[in-house]
Amino acid sequence: MGSLQTPIEMRSSSLLDTSCGYLLRELQMIWDEVGEDKFEREKVLLDIEQECVEAYRRKVDHANVSRSRLHQELAESEAELTHFLLCLGERSVPGRPEKKGGTLREQLDSIAPALREMRLRKDERVKQFRSVKGEIQKISAEIAGRSTYEDSTRKITIDDNDLSNKKLEEYQNELHRLHDEKNERLQKVDIYICAIRDLSATLGTEASMIITKIHPSLNDLYGISKNISDDILKKLNGTVVSLEEEKHKRLEKLHHLGRALSNLWNLMDASYEDRQKFFHVIDLLSSAPSDVCAPGSITLDIIQQAEAEVKRLDQLKASRIKELFIKKQKELEDTCNMSHMETPSTEMGNITNLVDSGEVDHVDLLAAMDEKIARAKEEAASRKGIIEKVDRWMLASDEERWLEEYDQDENRYSVSRNAHRNLRRAERARITVSKISGLVESILVKAKSWEVERQKVFLYNEVPLVAMLQEYNKLRQEKEMEKQRLREMKKMSIPQPVAEGDNFYMARPASSNRRISNRSMNGGFGSGSPINRKYSGGFNNTNNNYTALGTSIRRESRKSEA
């Protein structure tokens, strides 16, 4: 008990100034009054002391827990502050003391303002990141051709571990680059749209429909942001290229039509009123594609009007060329007929088709005709002397035929109205007939010389002249032999002498008379003569046959081009 008494007294003395000490004294008074045993008192006091110890232990444990929590909070605050410094790229917190001191609560109180400041900075930095990344996503969506609504549904992710100014500056640089790219694309779109409008105005097409067909956002009437994606830029560029090609194509067509109009005007001697309607087409001849930009200058209506005018003038030209060609053909035929040459055959329908199709130009056609006329005239000039002698021979042959018929007339010496006139003609005819042999020989010499010089046969109405003359000489010799035979027969049958001059043209057998009387103007040979049977075409075959001129003109034009 003594060992316990001291602690009790010590504890009692320590509790005198406390409520516990007061209660202990009150308990002792009660015990004294009751007469409680010391042992029991000691036991109760031990129980009280044990309970006090446990109460203190609980308080100490609670205090330890609180202290640990404060340590943890302080560590977490320090860690959070350090994290803020790292993610924000800050080296220190302004206003926070470098040395750490004081109680835990004081330390927490000292770090709390820095944490609040860093949280505010982080929140502000996150807002900046969200704003910049949102703009980046928006512009990227515009460049990619996605709608802003579709892109706004995407969540903006922020990396909390890197919110430094350096990272923010990188995003801002990216945003600045995207802004520049967007502006550049918008400028390209505006340039393309402006080019489409200018080209459409020049071509006379509706620019609004073309632009809307590419994408509705490009039309200002829709009031939405313009699509600036690569696909749209590609379509715009393709549209501009297509319009430029159409412009070049139309301009080339108008150049062709303008040259055709100019040539036709000069050829047809068109009036000023007819030309004035298409002066704008002629003005384009000296214009390059880059110079043609006036609205409505190369519309389809202008091209169609020019085509219609060219077609009209071509038809008029074809009609006049046909008239001119027929005139030249008549000149060629007259030249050939006068010189008894074969007329080159032509086919007017084929000629017209060749001119219309463009295979033969009217200039080449007329030049070919002029060349044929020139050749015909040159050949006619070379044949002139021979033809004149042939004509004289033909006339002499007619006289010879008439004289034969006259000599066979038994009543030629009878007194009649025309007897004296016929007698005088017979005298002249005998003189003419006597010169036929020399004339024929002269023609043969000249014709053979002409054939040697020209290296071709001399044709008279499509019949070889030399052969015709040789046949004539042969028949003339036969006729002389027949005359000689008849003379001998008469001498044998009639003893009286008869003057040869009076009996030269006595009656002849019917076969001889028929053969001689059937001789025609064409060299004095009838249809039954060998020369006419051989050359059945005759001497006067001057029909207008156009079967081969188209081919010959094409051949000659190709030769001249070669």
Curated annotation (Swiss-Prot):
It is found in: Nucleus; Cytoplasm; Cytoplasm, Cytoskeleton, Spindle pole. The record marks A426 as: Microtubule binding. Residues 61-81, 155-190, 299-324, 361-381, 465-494 form a coiled coil. It comes from the Eukaryota. Residues 553-562 have a biased composition (Basic and acidic residues). GO terms for biological process: cell division; microtubule cytoskeleton organization. Keywords: Cell cycle, Cell division, Coiled coil, Cytoplasm, Cytoskeleton, Microtubule, Mitosis, Nucleus. GO terms for molecular function: microtubule binding. The keyword Cytoplasm applies. Residues 542-562 are annotated as: Disordered. It holds the Pfam family MAP65_ASE1. GO terms for cellular component: microtubule; nucleus; phragmoplast; spindle; spindle pole. Forms a dimer. Binds to microtubules (MT). Bundles polymerized MT via the formation of 25-nm crossbridges following an intracellular dotted lines pattern and at the minus-end of phragmoplast MT near the nuclear surface. PANTHER family: 65-KDA MICROTUBULE-ASSOCIATED PROTEIN 8 (PTHR19321:SF3), PROTEIN REGULATOR OF CYTOKINESIS 1 PRC1-RELATED (PTHR19321). Belongs to the MAP65/ASE1 family. This is 65-kDa microtubule-associated protein 8. The gene is MAP65-8.
